[in-house]
Structure formats: structure tokens, C-alpha cells
Amino acid sequence: MVNEFEKLQSGKLLLASANLLESNFKRTVLIICEHNESGSLGFILNRPMEFKVCEAVAGFEEIEEPLHMGGPVQVDTVHFLHSRGDIIDGATEIFPGLFWGGDKNQVSFLLNTGVMQPSEIRFFLGYSGWSAGQLEEEFEIGSWYIAEASRDVIFSDAYERMWSRSVRSKGGEYQIVANAPELPGLN
């Protein structure tokens, strides 16, 4: 049987287990964009902020979409995932149809001219990062699950249900976990 951690690679979803109660990651869904011997990097998908992109990111004054908390690392940096690697220079493909980064000025131009739609991009403040071996240790103590990613999940605005739907999609015993109350002691 393959160890769950051995399935981890760029383009997979990282789901906080029900045991992970740390506030930065409780019931989060992350997309892993980089995973190698040096560590891992990803973005939290289900933590929209109260700020809109137009209020916080220079050059994107027309974008009324929410800015997302990508994670607790370098929260003074802005990152983006998008589906238009075919027209954005410097983008890194995460899986077919999903790209990370690229030329920010080009993205601004494409959005402002309507060539690219806001629904094709998601902006993040900061990122989630793990040093070499750190994420593996967290797996060993049961902090994370791995699931398949899709563009539908990445660009979904069903933030409240994203974690339970993603956990439930794993099937079997995970369906019970997905339905567990957030604070079982209050039942």
C-alpha cells in the first residue's frame, strides 16, 4: 500500500485533517504548487479575505474579486494562480490548465482589456511553505490528507463547503470525517 505522503506532488490538494486545529490551517484546502527535496509550497484556497484585489494590489484596480490568504509565510507578497498559461509569459504549469505566476504587467493588461476574465485567476497574499522534511513529519502525526485537484475546486467560490466536499471526495471513512462537526464538544 502506498503511503499517503508518497502521493504528494505538485498539483495535488492538501487537506487539513480533522485533527489539525492550528488556526492558520484548520479545515483548509491547499493546492501544492511545488514539492521537492527542499520543501513544499502551496496556497490556501478556502480563505478569502475581506479585501478585494482592487483594494490591495497595485495595477489591478478593476478587479473586484476577493484577495485570498495564501498562507502565513511572506504575507507581504502577492501570488496568483490562473488558467491562461497560453497567453501569460513566465507561468509555471501546475497541472494541465492550471498555472502559477507569470508576468504581472501582462496579467494586468489582459484583465483590464477583457482578454482574460477575473474568473480565470485567483490572487493570494502570502503562501504556505514547509522546509525539507517538515510536511512529511506533519503527515506522520496525521495532520493532512491528499486529494486530486481540479480547476473547479481551485476557482470555486464555495469556500464554506470546500473542505468538507474535498474530504468527502476521497470516499470511504473520509465521508464520516467530512461530516464531523467543527467543534464536536459543542454537540
Swiss-Prot record:
Do you know which Gene3D superfamilies this protein is assigned to?
Answer: VC0467-like
- What lineage, starting at the top, does this entry show? Bacteria, Pseudomonadati, Chlorobiota, Chlorobiia, Chlorobiales
Look up the domain of life of the source: Bacteria
Task: Tell me which GO cellular component terms the UniProt record holds.
Answer: cytosol
The UniProt entry, under SUPFAM superfamilies, shows:
VC0467-like (SSF143456)
Question: From which residue to which does the signal peptide run?
Answer: none
Q: Which InterPro entries does this one have?
A: AlgH-like
Coiled-coil features, chain-numbered ranges? none
Q: What is this protein called?
A: UPF0301 protein Cpha266_0885
Name the family. Answer: Belongs to the UPF0301 (AlgH) family.
